[in-house]
């Protein structure tokens, strides 16, 4: 039989973690002063007058560089538990991790050839 009382802690955590941000937004909305003016609408740059436009558009190559970084950062997250339990796991898990790394190396070579890693 499926017992719902086993998940009471989960539901309590879910409710509390949902109520706290909602309360924070409600309290700040009620207590915050509403003073609209030119000072509020201007952008802030370390206490000095802003030079140029506040909204700059980044080139797409920065996004591609960041995307390649995120892919290999996630690779590290996936390989860390495997490295910590390497002595307990068998050879088959080593082969699986090797295949995983080889697939990522193929992706790196592909990104390199497409010019995603070119900075200039």
From Swiss-Prot:
Keywords: Chloroplast, Membrane, NAD, NADP, Plastid, Plastoquinone, Quinone, Thylakoid, Translocase, Transmembrane, Transmembrane helix, Transport. The lineage of its organism: Eukaryota, Viridiplantae, Streptophyta, Embryophyta, Tracheophyta. It catalyses: a plastoquinone + NADH + (n+1) H(+)(in) = a plastoquinol + NAD(+) + n H(+)(out); a plastoquinone + NADPH + (n+1) H(+)(in) = a plastoquinol + NADP(+) + n H(+)(out). The gene is ndhC. The chain crosses the membrane at residues 9-29, 64-84, 88-108. GO terms for cellular component: chloroplast thylakoid membrane; NADH dehydrogenase complex. This is NAD(P)H-quinone oxidoreductase subunit 3, chloroplastic. Its main location: plastid. It comes from Ranunculus macranthus. HAMAP family: NDH1_NuoA. GO terms for molecular function: NADH dehydrogenase (ubiquinone) activity; quinone binding. Its EC number is 7.1.1.-. NDH is composed of at least 16 different subunits, 5 of which are encoded in the nucleus.
